[in-house]
Amino acid sequence: MDAELASWREAGQYFDYLGFDIFYRVAGSGPPLLLIHGYPFNSFDWAPIWPTLTQRFTVIAPDMMGMGFSAKPVAYEYSVHDHADMHEALLDHLGIGNAHILAHDIGDSVGQELLARHEVGQQAYGTLRIDSITWLNGGMFVETYTPRAAQKLMSRTPLGDIFSRVQNSPLSRRLLEPTVREMFGPNTKPTRHMMDVFNEILDYNDGRRVLHKVGRFINDRYTHRNRWVRAMRQTAVPMRLIDGPIDPNSGAHMA
């Protein structure tokens, strides 16, 4: 395993969620800040800004079920609601009742669900009060969300279950890498080393076999769109959007 990635894992710990091990990191001092990572990687996404954030906040960064260093069960109903439950359970486990949120990609949808619960006081675990939310690129509005064709085929059709059997093949990696690179700007494309690290994260605990199942969160975006957007329109929680305009899924066309 890459040394920096291994160091990230060694600095973390696990808690039990529904009988599964969920990886998370906590560091820093100050107001609690919950980081909700994107799909299909994990909390290591935050590594470049981790030192800066931990200077000002007590930072909590879990890996969602099916991703990163957390459990990746095959027989599991992955959903945005379940991811939201896990984040609430973790904060409750840590004795944290309020937090700022920084969310990205699928994390935006999880943040929207947490916000909707916050507005009516109906949390699954604990009594989380949201101090603020900062949204990074993510499909918060399905009418402007344009997922890649491969993601739609793998996540919204039976092809996902069929192709999951060959997800660990070299061909699968070659097909995935252009999609990943497309998410980056022209001056920030991942190096070969970074792509190798991404592949290590996906391969950990045979994670590619559930990649398409986790990716079905895009269906939740359609199902719960009105409830989530209503919460955003009605809330008094301070919000900010930081949007990379070149993102083909949710770039300038969403902002």
Where are the language model's segments positioned?
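The serine-hydrolase catalytic nucleophile loop
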Residues: 39-50
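Well-ordered beta-strand positions
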Residues: 16, 25-26
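Flexible "cap/lid" subdomain of the alpha/beta-hydrolase fold that forms the substrate-access gate
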Residues: 1-13, 20-22, 32, 40, ...
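Proline/glycine-enriched tight loop/beta-turn segments at coil->beta junctions
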Residues: 27-33, 57
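A short, Lys/Arg-enriched amphipathic alpha-helix followed by its capping loop at the start of a domain
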Residues: 48-57, 93
